[in-house]
């Protein structure tokens, strides 16, 4: 119960929370009002870097959301050319994470990471379609238990300035397992074949729990 009210924070947040607390103490010495502003800032930093436990369905016939946020797009596209998949058609679901969403990303399926590819880029608004090709991003190619390739892409946004990858090539993953995070506003794209989408544009998602697609 306590974990639900006060979830642990991601290790990426330790430094930011420490800085926020120090600033809060300094501001409180100057003024109670300023100290309260600092306290609100500290609470927001804690909230942003929260890393709650999630319970996945653990079913190979479903894909779960890789991110908390809102579904921006659901459409058929060519596969990412960066991974040599441009000659194949995939369903692509894009999920936008605003600064109030949990930014820890998770794998949508059980499987093995066959490739991780980082691409430097711009920091355009992550809600724009061209962010998929222009922004800083990190690709994960995951081979699921059916032998199919599921692609997850972390995309940095207008405010985000660091993509954190916590996984490695050939790592075996369980559905809903953490693979990384993005700091301060961003987006996650999922590419898949042979699954039927279960979500619609505007729908809210929870990483590791919301069902994105089914066989």
UniProtKB/Swiss-Prot annotation:
- Disulfide linkage: none
| Highest taxon, organism lineage | Bacteria
Entry's cofactor comment: Binds 1 pyruvoyl group covalently per subunit.
Record EC number: 4.1.1.65
| Topological type in the membrane | Peripheral membrane protein
Example GO CC term: the record gives: plasma membrane
Asked if the keyword Cell wall biogenesis/degradation belongs to this entry, the reply reads no
Its GO biological process annotations read: phosphatidylethanolamine biosynthetic process
List the InterPro entries: PS_Dcarbxylase, PSD-A
In Gene Ontology terms, what is one molecular function of this protein? phosphatidylserine decarboxylase activity
- Give the record's pathway: Phospholipid metabolism; phosphatidylethanolamine biosynthesis; phosphatidylethanolamine from CDP-diacylglycerol: step 2/2
Q: Which reaction does it catalyse?
A: a 1,2-diacyl-sn-glycero-3-phospho-L-serine + H(+) = a 1,2-diacyl-sn-glycero-3-phosphoethanolamine + CO2
Q: Please name the catalytic residues of this protein.
A: 186
Q: According to its UniProt record, where is this protein located? A: Cell membrane
- Posttranslational mods: Is synthesized initially as an inactive proenzyme. Formation of the active enzyme involves a self-maturation process in which the active site pyruvoyl group is generated from an internal serine residue via an autocatalytic post-translational modification. Two non-identical subunits are generated from the proenzyme in this reaction, and the pyruvate is formed at the N-terminus of the alpha chain, which is derived from the carboxyl end of the proenzyme.
Query: What Pfam families does its record include?
Result: PS_Dcarbxylase (PF02666)
Broad class of the protein's primary localization: membrane
- Family of the protein in this entry: Belongs to the phosphatidylserine decarboxylase family. PSD-A subfamily.
Subunit architecture: Heterodimer of a large membrane-associated beta subunit and a small pyruvoyl-containing alpha subunit.
Give the function comment from the record: Catalyzes the formation of phosphatidylethanolamine (PtdEtn) from phosphatidylserine (PtdSer).
Output the PANTHER family linked to this UniProt entry.
ARCHAETIDYLSERINE DECARBOXYLASE PROENZYME-RELATED
**Can you say what this protein is called?**
Phosphatidylserine decarboxylase proenzyme
Organism placement in taxonomy:
Bacteria, Pseudomonadati, Pseudomonadota, Alphaproteobacteria, Candidatus Pelagibacterales
